[in-house]
C-alpha cells in the first residue's frame, strides 16, 4: 500500500487523506477528527511525515479508531508511534487483543464526543461514528460507499454478512442530524447528508420490492 503524500482539510476539525491499494483495487480514505481530547485517526492509512506533522500541529493524538475488521490498515504503526489506545468493536479483532485495546459498542461515546453506532450485518465489527458539533458528521466504514462504480450506495450484498440486517441498522442514522458524511471508500459528502441518506434508503426500499 502506497503512502499518502497530502491531506485535505474539509472542515476546521476534520481532515481526510487517501491512497490507492493495488491489492484491493480500491481507493482507501482515512479521517482525522479533532475533539476536546485531541486528534482521533479513523481507519488510518500511512501518511508521509511532513503532512502528518502539519495535520497534527501541536495537538495530541487521542487514539486510533477502526470501523471494522478489514480496516486496521496502518493502525498498529500509529498506536506504537504515539502510544495511544485502539478503539474497536470486539468482533473486528477476534484473534487479536493489542495492547491498549478499548472495546466499543453501540451508544458508547469516545472522548465524550464521538458516538458509536453499530451497523450489524455489514463487515465484522462494523460501526459508524457520529460527531454532533458543526451541524453533525458521520464517519462510516464499509456499510456506505461513495466511489466508482457504485456512487453513493450501500455496501453490495456479496460483501455483507447479512444485507437485510445491515439495511435495518443503517436506518438508525436517520435519527441524527448530520450535514456531512466521511467515508473509508470515497469522497466525502459535505452538505445535505440527511437528505442524501433519506433518498438512498427510499431508493433501496423500492429496489427490494
What are these regions (language model features)?
Residues 16-63:
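Pre-active-site segment of Zn-dependent metallo-hydrolases
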Residues 40-42, 63-66, 116, 182-183:
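Short catalytic-loop micro-motif centered on adjacent basic/acidic residues
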Residues 48-49, 69-74, 93-96, 145-147, ...:
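Active-site environment of divalent metal-dependent phosphoester hydrolases
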Residues 48-89:
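Active-site metal-binding motif and surrounding structural segment of the metallo-beta-lactamase
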Amino acid at each position: 500500500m502506497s503512502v499518502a503524500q497530502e491531506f485535505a482539510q474539509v472542515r476546521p476539525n476534520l481532515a481526510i487523506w487517501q491512497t490507492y491499494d493495488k491489492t484491493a483495487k480500491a481507493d482507501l480514505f482515512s479521517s482525522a477528527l479533532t475533539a476536546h481530547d485531541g486528534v482521533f485517526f479513523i481507519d488510518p492509512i500511512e501518511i508521509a511525515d511532513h503532512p502528518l506533522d502539519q495535520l497534527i500541529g501541536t495537538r495530541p493524538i487521542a487514539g486510533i479508531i477502526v470501523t471494522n475488521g478489514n480496516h486496521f490498515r496502518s493502525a498498529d504503526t500509529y498506536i506504537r508511534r504515539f502510544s495511544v489506545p485502539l478503539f474497536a468493536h470486539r468482533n473486528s479483532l477476534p484473534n487479536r487483543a493489542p495492547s491498549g485495546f478499548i472495546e466499543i459498542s453501540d451508544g458508547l461515546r469516545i472522548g465524550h464526543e464521538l458516538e458509536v453506532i453499530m451497523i450489524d450485518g455489514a463487515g465484522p465489527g462494523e460501526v459508524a461514528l457520529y460527531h454532533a458539533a458543526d451541524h453533525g458528521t458521520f464517519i462510516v466504514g464499509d456499510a456506505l460507499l461513495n466511489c466508482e462504480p457504485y456512487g453513493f450506495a450501500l455496501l453490495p450484498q456479496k460483501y455483507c454478512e447479512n444485507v437485510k440486517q445491515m439495511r435495518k441498522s443503517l436506518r438508525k442514522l436517520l435519527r441524527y442530524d448530520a450535514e456531512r458524511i466521511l467515508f473509508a471508500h470515497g469522497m466525502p459528502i459535505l452538505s445535505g447528508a440527511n437528505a442524501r441518506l433519506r433518498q438512498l434508503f427510499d431508493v433501496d426500499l423500492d429496489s427490494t420490492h
